[in-house]
């Protein structure tokens, strides 16, 4: 993959794994990430909370080659490693003077800066995610609705509701169903947390 394609991939897979907003992705700092043997750990946006994105292993039901292709932690590690050269990749800007993770290549029309990579903003992150979703055949969602698209697709594909709620960190089925659920099974009311039908 080219660096730009790897950026799209890393950003999109991380967005699906961690569900940040595009503005959080744009402000994501390199010093918040720590590589681990089993994945990556990062400080959650604006807090001191540590979260981990594990590397895919056998429990996902995918072959080894497929796991490597869709693993968010591996894609993010590869992107951070590839964009470490500060002579080509300008990690900071005047608005947020820290080392950004995601960058975009400057178009040829900018002369001396041609080919250089600069930090991206929230709109670029959103556009990248929307483009990846469109290429994957997921239409009707904005770049900021990766969490909603993933959860709705999971419901459509028969993933248990309690697993969808837990994985997506939804506060309740009612909130998810009322405001975010776009699945074909919207009218289905699960028995999450109930012990009887009464």
Question: PLM ranges: what are they?
Answer:
Residues 15-41, 86-90, 160-166:
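Short, charged phosphate-coordinating catalytic segments
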Residues 194-198:
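C-terminal secondary-structure termini that scaffold catalytic or DNA-interacting sites
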Residues 64-138:
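Active-site/catalytic core of tyrosine-dependent DNA strand-transfer enzymes
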Residues 167-193:
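Catalytic-site neighborhood detector that most strongly recognizes the C-terminal catalytic loop/helix
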Residues 27-73, 78-81:
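Conserved tyrosine-mediated DNA breakage-rejoining catalytic core shared by Y-recombinases
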Residues 1-4, 120, 140-141:
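N-terminal core-binding DNA-recognition domain of tyrosine site-specific recombinases/integrases
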Residues 122-166, 185:
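Short, basic (Lys/Arg/His-rich) helix/loop patches that form interaction surfaces
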Residues 1-22, 70, 147:
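Basic, Lys/Arg- and aromatic-enriched nucleic-acid-binding interface segment
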């Amino acid at each position: 993959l080219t660096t730009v394609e790897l950026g799209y991939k890393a950003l999109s897979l991380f967005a699906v794994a961690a569900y940040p907003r595009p503005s959080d992705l744009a402000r994501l700092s390199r010093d918040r990430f720590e590589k681990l043997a089993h994945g990556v750990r990062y400080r959650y946006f604006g807090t001191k909370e540590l979260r981990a994105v594990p590397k895919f292993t056998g429990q996902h039901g995918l072959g080894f080659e497929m796991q490597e292709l869709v693993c968010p932690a591996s894609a993010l590690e590869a992107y951070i490693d590839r964009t470490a050269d500060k002579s080509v990749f300008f990690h900071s800007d005047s608005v947020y003077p820290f080392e950004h993770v995601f960058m975009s290549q400057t178009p040829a029309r900018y002369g001396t800066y041609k080919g250089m990579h600069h930090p991206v903003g929230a709109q670029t992150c959103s556009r990248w995610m929307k483009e990846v979703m469109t290429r994957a055949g997921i239409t009707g969602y904005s770049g900021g609705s990766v969490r909603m698209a993933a959860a709705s697709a999971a419901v459509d594909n028969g993933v248990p509701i309690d697993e969808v709620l837990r994985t997506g960190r939804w506060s309740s089925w009612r909130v998810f169903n009322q405001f975010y659920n776009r699945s074909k099974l919207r009218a289905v009311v699960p028995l999450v947390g109930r012990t009887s039908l009464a």
